[in-house]
């Protein structure tokens, strides 16, 4: 069993999803959400809180911030014992720039064994992908995650409705 979080945002009327790319040591390379396997008796939500912090090295915040994101979840996918929570966040075009520069610096200056064995360096970069880029992204995703992207594309109309409704509510 496993779980992950996929941040979503609206920009210029289109949905954008924040994906992370596995580092060069990953057994299954490619793009995916921010998640992983459950530890012990963790619930999917507990897994997301832990994994979201680890894989984004705190860029989305700590446990309270991840819990808040989860409480605003707009869509949930369950595929092959994996639960993915699609959660809205404000679009920040600079987030990938800062995260990616930070990761490049750390991953070139730290001992490679630390990078290889530490849970906080699983992602080498992050990037916003628009809803129209998902089909092109799918073959670049981790093998297990390609089915999840396929289902995500099928669910886009539903996600679009909910995210736009929630973003209009927040602006009032």
Regions found by a protein language model. Give the residues of each.
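Short beta-strand micro-motifs in enzyme catalytic cores
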Residues: 1, 16, 81-85, 125-127
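N-terminal strand-loop-strand
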Residues: 1-34
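Short, well-ordered beta-strand micro-motif
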Residues: 7-9, 21, 86-88, 127-130
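Nudix hydrolase/Nudix homology domain
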Residues: 25-30, 94-172
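Functional cleft and adjacent loop/helix regions within the main domain
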Residues: 26, 30-35, 40, 77, ...
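The catalytic Nudix box helix
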Residues: 33-71
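Hydrophobic pocket-lining residues within nucleotide cofactor-binding pockets
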Residues: 38, 89, 134
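Acidic, glycine-rich loop-and-strand cores that form catalytic or ligand-binding grooves
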Residues: 61, 65-111
